[in-house]
Amino acid sequence: MSRQQIGVVGMAVMGRNLALNIESKNYSVSIFNRTRSVTEEVFNQNKKKNIVPYFSIKDFIDSLLKPRCILLMVQSGKATDETIKMILPYLEKEDILIDAGNTFYKDTIRRNEKLSKYEINFIGMGVSGGELGALNGPSIMPGGQKEAYKLVLPMLEKISAKFKGEPCVSYIGPNGAGHYVKMVHNGIEYGDMQLISESYFLLKYLLNMSNEELSSTFSKWNKGELNSYLIEITKNIFIEKDEKGKYLIDRILDVAEDKGTGKWISKSALDLREPLSLITESVFARYLSSLKRQRIIASKILQGPKIKTFIKDKNSFIEEVRRALYLGKIISYAQGFSQLKRASEKYHWNLKYGEIAKIFRAGCIIRANFLQKITDEYTQNKNVVNLLLTPYFSKIANEYENSLRNIVMYAIKYGISTPTFSAAISYYDSYRALYLPANLIQAQRDYFGSHTYQRTDQTGYFHTNWSQ
């Protein structure tokens, strides 16, 4: 009996497309799905391809060359644990199990530890690019046993996205490192999307720009510093029309949903004591948008500015928004990469930040030209503390901070919500501040809780019996 080179479990759209991607690179693929009809459907649609369906987990695993390589693309959480439990009795030492789902990194750490006891290699692999990326080439973030990674690297390089011929895949680190980086990627994606949405609202409601004008503006932006996948699709979204010839964007309900993964990075930030303010505000912005009924009521009760909109120079304002958006994006990445550094230190992952930026350059949702700037900065200095302190990004920050400040002032003046722009300038001012009002907070803590404080003129910790 001929055996296949790799098996894929989970035939929803992502698993299906990854299987097809792998097969297209001259690999033979076994497929399995708990629901028999789904497996049959995938096979029947691809009979001419080197894909072999199996309907029992034992037959599926027996069909694979040793050491077996099995890729899981199932729902994260309980479903992944149940699938591993189902597969485990049939696995042998040195087999490789790859979890390519959108998995919480602590689950990956736990599973890696458990499977290591059986001498089974477990790779937690972040995959970005959506269903089309899975089919045509995603950005891939594998973490786990390095020796196992080396065995699957030839396949991963072939199926990954390419940036100027360079595969967008690199070994991230041990156990949960790959899924942690994917989590940070998702958080940056949240931040990017919210910043772009706030830019759209400022242009639409302060300049009364039409959808055609918005599309044209974003098209120009996409030819410069802001060149990215998200800017590219946004310019297309503005001019998409429905079956009645109406602009679709104007008929989409203003409620942004999420799959719950956005909050993971914010929870981790709190655990690590990392000020991930912009990205966390982008998560909260989605939650606030979901309060649609309450917002309708509030719009009739709570007052805002009643002054008439007046922007003297339209082109100058558009440029201010562009600059604010670029600096906001930089601050978002600065926060995300700062958190990666803190997590790497805590979990002893030894992350390579320049390599991480490189694999984001193609295939993934946050792909953008400016990622090369991040790679360049880490190439010149492997001990970057914060991207805002590097030569290129500090230069941009100093040139663009006034635009970011002006945009937030305009938003406040005219009552337009800009949570991530506001978080960006607040973080920027706090981060560059020689002094913050935290001395008063520490005095208050000592006053009511005897928590002590440090002094600027003496070493050690002090407590005062404050006057009542």
From Swiss-Prot:
One Pfam family hit: NAD_binding_2
Signal peptide extent: none
Binding site residues for substrate: 102, 128-130, 185-186, 190, 259, 286, 445, 451
GO biological process terms held by the UniProt record: D-gluconate metabolic process; organic acid catabolic process; pentose-phosphate shunt
Enzyme class: oxidoreductase
Superkingdom: Bacteria
Key words of the record: Gluconate utilization, NADP, Oxidoreductase, Pentose shunt
Cysteines joined through disulfide linkages: none
Alphabetized SUPFAM superfamilies for the sequence: 6-phosphogluconate dehydrogenase C-terminal domain-like (SSF48179), NAD(P)-binding Rossmann-fold domains (SSF51735)
Gene Ontology molecular functions: NADP binding; phosphogluconate dehydrogenase (decarboxylating) activity
Catalysed transformations (reactions): 6-phospho-D-gluconate + NADP(+) = D-ribulose 5-phosphate + CO2 + NADPH
UniProt EC number: 1.1.1.44
Pathway assignment: Carbohydrate degradation; pentose phosphate pathway; D-ribulose 5-phosphate from D-glucose 6-phosphate (oxidative stage): step 3/3
Oligomer and partners: Homodimer.
Function statement: Catalyzes the oxidative decarboxylation of 6-phosphogluconate to ribulose 5-phosphate and CO(2), with concomitant reduction of NADP to NADPH.
Family matches, as NCBIfam families: gnd, PRK09287.1
Name of the protein: 6-phosphogluconate dehydrogenase, decarboxylating
Source organism per UniProt: Buchnera aphidicola subsp. Acyrthosiphon pisum (strain APS)
Gene: gnd
